[in-house]
A protein has these predicted regions:
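Conserved catalytic core of the tyrosine transesterase superfamily
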Residues: 1-240
Length: 240
């Protein structure tokens, strides 16, 4: 587990660098949008916006026969709702960098949300006349099946972390050194259901063993208290 300040700072720094790279592939006016929302969105949210908008403007470049670098903000006023709906339909089967790709309803909904956020920003700042993106219905999302491990599967994973049957020589010595750590991390991960990104951002100071609780940093930066059972506590105690 990493020092949480270093982990999140480095992650945000890397994410912001990637956003700057993607801005080079977007129309010049998109920089105003990204700088304008920087104080009320996370870096990961902005990165997703950048990826989605790159696909959107690449599509418009092909359809309108206008290089992305020559697009002006007036283009957003020229587009009709049907133009964005055609883009969503295009996402069912499209190419990016020579690769064939396809978006399901959830992917289309995310890209529409990115387009809406951009339109909303420029409309609220009186930089465009209309917000046509707000007129488009969100693609219907089908309920996503949640796949869970049963008790036996969880036990098998934890037993595998402790077993040295698959190792020999130097690998076994290395495994023996990290066995307790791996078991503790997997116990916490499987016992609480936190995300991997939340797990790697934890620090020893985040844990309160008197109350079997810990503080996790959620998506968006919110801090939440979660609880673990005695089995997880014992595994963490053995390691820490």
């Amino acid at each position: 587990m990493a020092n949480k300040n270093d982990y999140f700072s480095l992650r945000n720094e890397h994410t912001n660098d990637k956003i700057d790279e993607l801005l080079a592939d977007l129309p010049y006016f998109c920089a105003d949008f990204f700088y304008g929302i920087a104080n009320n969105t996370s870096a990961l949210t902005r990165l997703n916006y950048a990826y989605d908008l790159r696909i959107f403007f690449t599509y418009l470049s092909e359809i309108k026969k206008i290089p992305v670098e020559e697009m002006s903000l007036s283009l957003l006023d020229e587009l009709k709702a049907v133009d964005i709906e055609r883009f969503l339909n295009y996402l069912s089967n499209y190419k990016l960098n020579g690769k064939k790709l396809s978006c399901n309803e959830r992917g289309k909904a995310r890209k529409l949300a990115s387009i809406r956020a951009m339109y909303r920003y420029f409309f609220n700042h009186d930089m465009i006349k209309a917000n046509v993106a707000s007129k488009i219905d969100t693609p219907k999302l089908h309920e996503k099946e949640i796949i869970r491990l049963d008790g036996d599967e969880v036990e098998q994973i934890l037993n595998l972390a402790e077993s040295d049957a698959a190792f020999s020589g130097k690998k076994q010595a290395y495994h023996n050194k990290l066995r307790v750590r791996d078991h503790a991390i997997l116990s916490l991960f499987l016992g609480t259901g936190i995300r991997i990104s939340e797990l790697v951002g934890l620090n020893v100071d985040d844990f309160d063993f008197d109350n079997n609780s810990f503080v996790v940093t959620r998506k968006g930066g919110n801090r939440t208290i979660l609880y673990f059972n005695d089995e997880v506590k014992d595994a963490l105690y053995e390691w820490l």
